[in-house]
């Protein structure tokens, strides 16, 4: 029996946008089988027990052109904010290598909730929703285990427990309700969640540190067609995209999107604008912005 939807974001199931099943949680966090592209992002700033400052970013990207070809990738980056250095790692699961006999997809993504793994060349990667002692999902609470290798050959690993402090926000606030045009594709969905609390362990080469952070950022998009399909005319180079998250000292976070038409002198295109997230106010949206 399906549980009734709740207006309390701290409980599942939760309807972020009334009347739109695409933004019903926990399903919105998981894989969308009817979409050719599905993307998961998590990023944040971390402080080590030693006082050192780090940041990280990871991307899981599921691509199924024509719903038959596997063209996925996983990216993990660590940033040493004190020294101004960074390491990035990306593992691809692309044709023709993954079309060889016996090849299996590297990425597994569950439907109905977030439970995702990727078998990278640097090791096994996981991002999944935590469960309580009764095996019930704990809303927006994740175990994240990321691995990679930096350009110098040093191993990178980040193990985090991530917990929420505020509700997810539909991109564009009440004006768009999370349903936008992206890279020329209408009916693209996106939400984000900021103020995520993170605790865990960072390992990078010979460095091993216990880390914490309170400015974690989860971001999601899912596209009816492959994300770089080029929209109606099929030109995959027609659009460019800038995306920023800014965390202000007053507790307001900004998700800023700007899209441009490369074929028309980089004219600004929809969806573009800034959406706010804060702990004590409804999200707001503005499209008249300068960056």
Predicted regions and their residues:
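Structured soluble/peripheral alpha/beta segments that form catalytic or ligand/cofactor-binding pockets
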Residues: 2-291
